[in-house]
Amino acid sequence: MEDAIERLAEHVVNTNLSDIPNKAIQSAKTYVLDTIGVGLAGSTGPYVKELLNTYSLPSLPQVTSRVLGQNVKLNPADAALINGFQIHNSEFDCVHEEAVIHTMTVLLAVIFADADRRGGISGSKLLESAVLGVDVACNLGVACSS
């Protein structure tokens, strides 16, 4: 008998963009654009320069990933951290109230950094990743708060 985690993993692995309802795809497009917008706005927010100064060390390996609104590339983990900070620092990022999670902040910061590391991804793969990530994160959040 498979457990809930196995079912969740199978759902993610076996779901393609064509399986996702159009309404979810349209919502994802809106939320991706919104998240990019608040991330760019947050690029001039408090403590961003301090974070960039801390994480912009030239000796770090795998400097491949861009930071929103900044003329800098960092290793993927650091770029994801700073992008997430910038997206969230003005508190205009979207939140799933029931799951109590800022899903797009966490997911897109990582998706963008990983896409740069890989040399890019298609828009459809970005949307598929975002929709499935939101699905997993929100369901786990709701399960934990129930």
Regions found by a protein language model. Name each.
Residues M1-S146:
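N-terminal core-entry segment
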